[in-house]
Amino acid sequence: MAKDDSTVRCFQGLLIFGHVIVGMCGIALTAECIFFVSDQHSLYPLLEATNNDDIFGAAWIGMFVGICLFCLSVLAIVGIMKSNRKILLAYFIMMFIVYGFEVASCITAATQRDFFTTNLFLKQMLMRYQNNSPPTNDDEWKNNGVTKTWDRLMLQDHCCGVNGPSDWQKYTSAFRVENNDADYPWPRQCCVMDKLKEPLNLDACKLGVPGYYHSQGCYELISGPMDRHAWGVAWFGFAILCWTFWVLLGTMFYWSRIEY
């Protein structure tokens, strides 16, 4: 293939453009995954306590892949401009490895969405919230994390329990073992607070008088951010894979036509 052929130059330009897009997508993927692993909603302790934080693992992989895509796109552009078979061969080998990692990241993130169920967080809350008798230090760490996260959620987002305050009445829980039902029908954080973060009317809150306690559950506030992040990592990654596949295919064709 002659290097001064106008058709070749046009094809080189298309491949370079394709790799510029790949590099930009890599930067965007890294930024998205950094935002996710920074845990803006501070929900990681709830996932850690389930012993399944694979969605964060998928995001860490996505961050690594994004950086690699940017670097490899630069390498590919250099190889295309120089029509260098060795550079492009090195690019192919590394890109296949990175591509496989991104496939794993997308699959992991997409499948985790079904993991965020109501029963999962309900069981965890009942078992770990204010559980002062953990069997191991690891359980103590997880119990403290779950308790602090739930206290913050209920105060900050004006919700109570997973489905509502009735969760604390219907089911056996560590909270019920530690607290008297008459004094603590549900945690104090379920009460409507004044500016000093004190219950507006504690007795009315205990009796369940509307307007003095939060009747809304917290499930949507937990699963919503997790679902959005899972779909973001999965589907943006999948879109990048689709684009990269065709760019990679075109580059392989170009490589096969370079003269020795």
Curated annotation (Swiss-Prot):
Membrane-spanning segments: 16-36, 60-80, 87-107, 230-250
Subcellular location: Membrane
Membrane-topology annotation of the record: Multi-pass membrane protein
Stretches assigned to the Cytoplasmic side: 1-15, 81-86, 251-260
A Pfam family the protein falls into: Tetraspanin
Record's GO cellular component terms: apical plasma membrane; apical plasma membrane urothelial plaque
Residues on Extracellular side: 37-59, 108-229
GO BP annotations listed: epithelial cell differentiation; response to bacterium
PTM annotation, UniProt: N-glycosylated with high-mannose oligosaccharides.
Tissues in which the UniProt entry reports expression: Bladder epithelium.
InterPro entries in UniProt: Tetraspanin/Peripherin, Tetraspanin_EC2_sf
Keywords: Glycoprotein, Membrane, Transmembrane, Transmembrane helix
Role: Component of the asymmetric unit membrane (AUM); a highly specialized biomembrane elaborated by terminally differentiated urothelial cells. May play an important role in normal bladder epithelial physiology, possibly in regulating membrane permeability of superficial umbrella cells or in stabilizing the apical membrane through AUM/cytoskeletal interactions.
Similarity comment: Belongs to the tetraspanin (TM4SF) family.
Subunit and partners: Heterodimer with uroplakin-3A (UPK3A) or uroplakin-3B (UPK3B).
Protein name: Uroplakin-1b
Species of origin: Mus musculus
